């Protein structure tokens, strides 16, 4: 693929190649150092440090046209020089950015100074760069718009790594901007220098090291286009400090230079391909839909498709909410901790319609046995995913939304001819639902964590935006909260990054100020980014925290119980010297940040406690003490098959 810095420009309106899209990996855009051009007409000498370090005088606004046919009002005159940092911030404004999650440092100070001169961009100040990137993810996942995070060089930049990897695996549109040491110091092991472009090469869709201030408008435009087009993902822009300080007159009319990428973006699906899929549906007796994160933007079309066909829907962890979990045709989640009936449906299906999924190991278990009786149709926007893990019988590289629209038209036009009826199959699955419902046991006054989520679902009528950390609580939140719409469910699915839930809730609350946002968290995950309580308080965000506290690293402990004879290997998170006390005291963390908090230990008191949490204005933490013996069930052991499914037992049982 051509590099992003190719000399052959292509505009947004250029027609894509008429050829079939070639296989394309998200890793195929190499970074390059753009040579500094001789542009003395636009630049001021770097030596005038007195000018660079003085406040920038803002000229009267001048209207300029943007690419989106809206009038953008710049705070600078068209021919007025301004710092590279101000050009960067204005480039963000021109992309419609309203919020960034930025933590300052020496190499990014100029960017922060420029942000203070912006009247349209709000900075939500995290208390750790990882909190900032996870908050940007929460913003993006809940809104569908790209999330923006900014960090300084060195440790600030490396603190973004987990968030970038998470966004890459879960296809989240993210633009990360990092400060870098001045160009002359790059490669000298300067203070707080890390080669963040090299560090993040394999965990970003693309990244840039800006070597010419003139390139900032083009690079920012490309970064947003890359992050949001095709299969979304993170893009990193590394900006040396001297570039931020350099004075220049920006050229906002530069075209993007992405000819290779543009020519390989997927084409609209061919009608003949969609007709072939409809034919397979008409010939099947036991079809099932397997939908993932690639279907989140297609919920309306998916709903219509299910209405026209009557095919039951199983969802991945990423796909929760693309089809209402409370609908009778929903099988909820499939995979390792999916419902028995969802996994039964895949096991016994004769046609698997895989839309926007990647056949990952937590869904498939043993690949050879997964959907072994079924013909497989795979539709995905990333051709690298098709055939990567499971070879389909029919594949379409394209947008799931467009494919569903096309199939819906075919189905509507041929409804009388097709007369699809899968009633017998649906009855069989209904029997499985009755035989193997999601359930839990109650022991005395102890609070089952599943019950807490069930009550939250009832009291919020399934309308809350839910974020989670990673572990048992994450799986219970996936199972027992009935998501009605896409972008209600925010969770680190592919990477499984603990500490995600609290900052993600911050981003979701910023993006959706009128929504109920609840972080369902575990004590292990919560404490990994507990410092973000300060951000919640300072920003006065109405984030609710339902903390399922079992004093253990629950999911690892569950595996210890099942596969290691319950030998505890550093999974107890309390104080061994005071096992009868709750440690640490999460209420004191909340109190230190001025956030109301309460603890509940008895099942009979739980409903009222959750209602109080929801009714209290602003943020609130509810510490729900749960027994550590609970296991997430059902469970198919790693690498197992449907016949290996576990439906009984917990930490009170010996294995």
Swiss-Prot record:
FAD binds at residues 231, 337-358, 380-399. Keywords: Amino-acid biosynthesis, Branched-chain amino acid biosynthesis, Chloroplast, FAD, Flavoprotein, Herbicide resistance, Magnesium, Metal-binding, Plastid, Thiamine pyrophosphate, Transferase, Transit peptide. Residues 1-82 form a transit peptide. Its cofactor is Mg(2+); thiamine diphosphate. Thiamine diphosphate binds at residue 129. Belongs to the TPP enzyme family. This is Acetolactate synthase 1, chloroplastic. It comes from Brassica napus (Rape).
